[in-house]
Amino acid sequence: STGFLKMLTLCKHLRDLQFDIVLDPFETMPSFKHSLILSSLKDSYILGFDQWYKRYYSFYHPHDECLKEHMSTRATEILKHIYGEGEFSTDYDLHLPVDVEDKIKEFIGDTRIVIINPLGAKKICRLTFEQIKVIYQEMKLHFENYRVIFTGLPQDLLTIPIPEIETLPFNEFIYTVALTKYSDFVISVDTALVHIAAAYHKPTLAFYPNSRTPEYPSHLIWSPNNHKSIQIVSPTFT
Protein backbone atom coordinates (compact mmCIF):
# COMPACT_ATOMS: atom_id res chain seq x y z
CA SER A 1 0.00 0.00 0.00
CA THR A 2 0.98 3.65 -0.35
CA GLY A 3 1.13 4.02 3.42
CA PHE A 4 3.58 1.13 3.77
CA LEU A 5 5.81 2.48 0.98
CA LYS A 6 5.90 5.86 2.73
CA MET A 7 6.88 4.11 5.95
CA LEU A 8 9.76 2.30 4.22
CA THR A 9 10.92 5.59 2.70
CA LEU A 10 10.85 7.20 6.15
CA CYS A 11 12.83 4.34 7.66
CA LYS A 12 15.46 4.60 4.93
CA HIS A 13 15.76 8.33 5.63
CA LEU A 14 16.09 7.74 9.39
CA ARG A 15 18.93 5.26 8.85
CA ASP A 16 20.95 8.07 7.29
CA LEU A 17 20.50 10.35 10.32
CA GLN A 18 22.28 10.44 13.66
CA PHE A 19 20.54 11.63 16.83
CA ASP A 20 22.18 12.28 20.19
CA ILE A 21 19.15 10.83 21.96
CA VAL A 22 15.77 9.51 20.84
CA LEU A 23 12.87 9.38 23.30
CA ASP A 24 10.08 6.82 23.08
CA PRO A 25 8.10 7.99 26.11
CA PHE A 26 4.63 6.50 25.64
CA GLU A 27 3.07 3.07 25.92
CA THR A 28 1.23 1.85 22.83
CA MET A 29 -0.37 -1.31 21.60
CA PRO A 30 2.15 -3.47 19.69
CA SER A 31 2.76 -1.98 16.26
CA PHE A 32 4.86 -3.29 13.39
CA LYS A 33 5.34 0.25 12.06
CA HIS A 34 6.57 1.42 15.45
CA SER A 35 9.07 -1.43 15.47
CA LEU A 36 10.28 -0.51 11.98
CA ILE A 37 10.92 3.09 13.00
CA LEU A 38 12.83 2.10 16.13
CA SER A 39 14.91 -0.47 14.26
CA SER A 40 15.88 2.25 11.77
CA LEU A 41 17.45 4.26 14.62
CA LYS A 42 19.93 1.58 15.67
CA ASP A 43 22.89 3.98 15.51
CA SER A 44 21.24 6.43 17.94
CA TYR A 45 20.82 6.24 21.71
CA ILE A 46 17.18 5.38 22.42
CA LEU A 47 15.61 5.92 25.83
CA GLY A 48 12.28 4.11 25.94
CA PHE A 49 9.47 3.28 28.35
CA ASP A 50 7.36 0.78 26.42
CA GLN A 51 8.13 -2.79 27.40
CA TRP A 52 6.86 -4.05 24.01
CA TYR A 53 9.94 -2.51 22.37
CA LYS A 54 12.70 -3.27 24.90
CA ARG A 55 14.82 -4.99 22.25
CA TYR A 56 15.14 -1.74 20.28
CA TYR A 57 16.12 0.50 23.18
CA SER A 58 19.60 1.44 24.33
CA PHE A 59 18.04 1.87 27.77
CA TYR A 60 14.63 0.65 28.91
CA HIS A 61 13.20 2.69 31.79
CA PRO A 62 10.63 0.82 33.92
CA HIS A 63 9.02 4.00 35.28
CA ASP A 64 5.33 3.53 36.13
CA GLU A 65 4.97 0.21 34.33
CA CYS A 66 1.48 -0.17 35.81
CA LEU A 67 0.45 3.29 34.53
CA LYS A 68 -0.82 4.87 37.73
CA GLU A 69 0.81 8.30 37.48
CA HIS A 70 0.42 11.44 35.40
CA MET A 71 2.61 11.67 32.30
CA SER A 72 4.42 14.71 33.72
CA THR A 73 6.16 12.41 36.22
CA ARG A 74 7.75 10.64 33.27
CA ALA A 75 9.19 13.93 32.08
CA THR A 76 10.99 14.18 35.42
CA GLU A 77 12.47 10.70 34.91
CA ILE A 78 13.69 11.66 31.43
CA LEU A 79 15.42 14.76 32.81
CA LYS A 80 17.02 12.73 35.60
CA HIS A 81 18.30 10.19 33.08
CA ILE A 82 19.90 12.92 30.99
CA TYR A 83 21.16 15.30 33.70
CA GLY A 84 21.33 13.18 36.86
CA GLU A 85 19.50 13.68 40.13
CA GLY A 86 18.12 17.14 40.84
CA GLU A 87 15.03 19.29 41.00
CA PHE A 88 13.32 19.86 37.66
CA SER A 89 10.36 21.93 36.59
CA THR A 90 7.83 20.17 34.39
CA ASP A 91 5.64 23.24 33.95
CA TYR A 92 4.40 23.72 30.41
CA ASP A 93 6.10 26.47 28.40
CA LEU A 94 4.30 27.70 25.29
CA HIS A 95 5.83 30.23 22.92
CA LEU A 96 3.49 32.62 21.12
CA PRO A 97 4.57 34.82 18.20
CA VAL A 98 4.16 38.50 19.04
CA ASP A 99 1.99 39.18 15.99
CA VAL A 100 -0.42 36.40 16.97
CA GLU A 101 -0.78 37.75 20.50
CA ASP A 102 -1.33 41.26 19.17
CA LYS A 103 -4.12 40.12 16.84
CA ILE A 104 -5.86 38.24 19.64
CA LYS A 105 -5.58 41.18 22.03
CA GLU A 106 -7.09 43.42 19.38
CA PHE A 107 -9.83 40.86 18.73
CA ILE A 108 -10.94 40.56 22.37
CA GLY A 109 -10.29 44.15 23.43
CA ASP A 110 -11.32 44.65 27.05
CA THR A 111 -13.96 41.88 27.03
CA ARG A 112 -13.91 38.79 29.21
CA ILE A 113 -13.82 35.43 27.47
CA VAL A 114 -15.25 31.95 27.98
CA ILE A 115 -13.98 29.32 25.53
CA ILE A 116 -16.07 26.29 24.61
CA ASN A 117 -14.37 23.53 22.63
CA PRO A 118 -17.15 20.94 22.22
CA LEU A 119 -16.02 18.75 19.32
CA GLY A 120 -12.66 17.01 19.49
CA ALA A 121 -10.88 15.37 16.57
CA LYS A 122 -11.74 11.90 17.91
CA LYS A 123 -15.37 10.78 17.85
CA ILE A 124 -15.15 9.68 21.48
CA CYS A 125 -14.19 13.25 22.43
CA ARG A 126 -17.38 14.99 21.34
CA LEU A 127 -20.36 16.43 23.14
CA THR A 128 -23.82 15.85 21.73
CA PHE A 129 -25.63 18.84 20.26
CA GLU A 130 -28.03 18.74 23.21
CA GLN A 131 -25.12 18.84 25.67
CA ILE A 132 -23.58 21.75 23.76
CA LYS A 133 -26.86 23.67 23.89
CA VAL A 134 -27.23 23.15 27.64
CA ILE A 135 -23.65 24.24 28.37
CA TYR A 136 -24.00 27.28 26.11
CA GLN A 137 -27.26 28.32 27.78
CA GLU A 138 -25.72 27.95 31.24
CA MET A 139 -22.74 30.06 30.24
CA LYS A 140 -24.95 32.79 28.82
CA LEU A 141 -27.03 32.73 32.00
CA HIS A 142 -24.24 32.74 34.58
CA PHE A 143 -21.58 34.63 32.57
CA GLU A 144 -23.85 37.23 31.00
CA ASN A 145 -21.11 39.86 30.71
CA TYR A 146 -18.69 37.47 29.01
CA ARG A 147 -18.17 36.63 25.36
CA VAL A 148 -18.61 32.91 24.72
CA ILE A 149 -16.30 31.87 21.88
CA PHE A 150 -16.39 28.41 20.30
CA THR A 151 -13.13 26.88 19.10
CA GLY A 152 -12.38 23.76 17.07
CA LEU A 153 -12.21 22.71 13.44
CA PRO A 154 -14.17 25.23 11.32
CA GLN A 155 -16.11 22.49 9.52
CA ASP A 156 -17.18 21.01 12.86
CA LEU A 157 -18.30 24.34 14.30
CA LEU A 158 -20.58 24.87 11.30
CA THR A 159 -22.60 21.81 12.35
CA ILE A 160 -23.54 23.19 15.78
CA PRO A 161 -27.28 24.00 15.69
CA ILE A 162 -27.03 27.23 17.68
CA PRO A 163 -27.64 30.43 15.71
CA GLU A 164 -24.97 33.11 15.58
CA ILE A 165 -22.37 31.51 17.84
CA GLU A 166 -19.09 33.40 17.95
CA THR A 167 -15.95 31.76 16.62
CA LEU A 168 -12.41 32.91 15.94
CA PRO A 169 -11.80 34.66 12.60
CA PHE A 170 -8.43 32.88 12.36
CA ASN A 171 -8.04 29.28 11.17
CA GLU A 172 -4.56 28.50 12.53
CA PHE A 173 -4.54 26.67 15.86
CA ILE A 174 -1.91 29.02 17.29
CA TYR A 175 -4.62 31.69 17.58
CA THR A 176 -6.65 29.35 19.76
CA VAL A 177 -3.58 29.00 21.98
CA ALA A 178 -3.31 32.79 22.24
CA LEU A 179 -7.03 33.14 22.92
CA THR A 180 -6.68 30.63 25.75
CA LYS A 181 -3.92 32.72 27.30
CA TYR A 182 -6.24 35.73 27.48
CA SER A 183 -9.42 33.85 28.39
CA ASP A 184 -11.10 33.65 31.79
CA PHE A 185 -12.60 30.16 31.66
CA VAL A 186 -12.18 27.12 29.38
CA ILE A 187 -14.59 24.26 28.69
CA SER A 188 -13.07 21.55 26.51
CA VAL A 189 -13.34 17.96 25.35
CA ASP A 190 -9.99 18.30 23.59
CA THR A 191 -7.03 17.16 25.68
CA ALA A 192 -4.61 19.46 23.86
CA LEU A 193 -6.64 22.54 24.77
CA VAL A 194 -7.02 21.30 28.35
CA HIS A 195 -3.23 21.22 28.71
CA ILE A 196 -2.84 24.58 26.98
CA ALA A 197 -5.23 25.98 29.58
CA ALA A 198 -3.08 24.33 32.26
CA ALA A 199 -0.01 26.09 30.90
CA TYR A 200 -1.72 29.42 31.53
CA HIS A 201 -3.32 28.31 34.82
CA LYS A 202 -6.84 28.91 33.53
CA PRO A 203 -9.95 27.64 35.33
CA THR A 204 -11.05 24.69 33.22
CA LEU A 205 -13.93 22.25 32.92
CA ALA A 206 -12.48 19.22 31.14
CA PHE A 207 -14.53 16.37 29.67
CA TYR A 208 -12.74 13.03 29.19
CA PRO A 209 -13.97 9.69 27.84
CA ASN A 210 -13.29 6.71 30.06
CA SER A 211 -10.41 4.48 29.02
CA ARG A 212 -11.13 1.60 26.66
CA THR A 213 -9.02 -0.71 28.78
CA PRO A 214 -8.02 -0.60 32.47
CA GLU A 215 -4.45 -1.35 31.40
CA TYR A 216 -4.21 2.12 29.86
CA PRO A 217 -6.12 4.63 32.05
CA SER A 218 -5.73 7.56 29.66
CA HIS A 219 -8.00 9.83 31.70
CA LEU A 220 -5.52 9.48 34.59
CA ILE A 221 -2.27 9.61 32.61
CA TRP A 222 -3.40 12.66 30.62
CA SER A 223 -5.55 14.35 33.27
CA PRO A 224 -5.58 18.18 33.22
CA ASN A 225 -2.56 18.61 35.53
CA ASN A 226 -4.08 21.91 36.65
CA HIS A 227 -5.23 22.66 40.18
CA LYS A 228 -7.79 25.09 38.72
CA SER A 229 -9.50 22.40 36.68
CA ILE A 230 -12.47 20.09 37.19
CA GLN A 231 -12.29 16.82 35.27
CA ILE A 232 -15.48 14.98 34.31
CA VAL A 233 -14.91 11.41 33.10
CA SER A 234 -17.59 9.66 31.06
CA PRO A 235 -18.84 6.36 32.52
CA THR A 236 -18.08 4.77 29.14
CA PHE A 237 -15.45 5.27 26.43
CA THR A 238 -18.01 6.57 23.92
Language-model features, listed with the residues they occupy:
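Catalytic machinery of carbohydrate-active enzymes
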Residues: 1-238
